Regions:
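Carbohydrate transferase catalytic cores enriched for Leloir-type hexosyltransferases
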Residues: 1-182
């Protein structure tokens, strides 16, 4: 009997709508995963249905086009339904908030908690989205914090269980490198 393939979805929907920040992180993550994924594993790039070209291609990578836009007020209804259809084992949400009701494990990345420190700088839509952080932290099976400070904030301010939070610093894009001295 063949071993079961581990199906990991990476939520890349935001990359269609915004450049920089979390989109840059997500694309770097996908490039890195494309280099290490192997037999018995499949990375499913969860893209916006509007994003017709694959964000990244490679062996053991596939694309799933989703209808639910990121940060949409019905995201917590539509996205879980779409993910159920994809039969994922794990979904990684680089943009903080996973589907709270789902049939797979979830890993979230928390880049910082500036939205808690400076809520007056957020739009009404952003306030609604980031107000889900407490539920997201409780719901996630694992949490990636990009720094020790973010990990500390998650534990102290949001009540994350310390054993669920792993620090994995963000890496600079390979575009950035030391220059030769002249």
């Amino acid at each position: 009997m063949a071993a079961k393939t581990l199906r990991v979805g990476v939520d890349a929907r935001l990359t269609y709508y915004r450049e920089g920040g979390i989109s840059t992180y997500t694309m770097g993550l996908l490039r890195g995963l494309a280099q290490v994924v192997g037999e018995g594993e499949e990375i499913i790039v969860l893209q916006s249905r509007k994003d017709r070209l694959p964000r990244i291609i490679g062996p053991y990578l596939s694309v799933a086009h989703l209808w639910t836009p990121p940060h949409h007020r019905l995201e917590q209804v539509g996205l879980p339904l779409e993910l159920t259809y994809r039969r994922l084992d794990v979904v990684h949400c680089p943009d903080f908030i996973p589907p709270l009701h789902r049939r797979c494990r979830a890993v979230i990345t928390v880049h910082d908690l500036a939205f808690l420190l400076y809520p007056h700088l957020l739009t009404e839509e952003s306030q609604r989205y980031y107000s889900q952080i407490d539920q997201a932290v409780k719901s996630a099976d694992a949490i990636i914090a990009v720094s020790e400070n973010t990990r500390k904030d998650l534990v102290e301010r949001v009540g994350a269980k310390p054993e669920k939070v792993v620090v994995i610093p963000e890496a600079a894009d390979e575009l950035y490198r030391p220059l030769e001295r002249e």
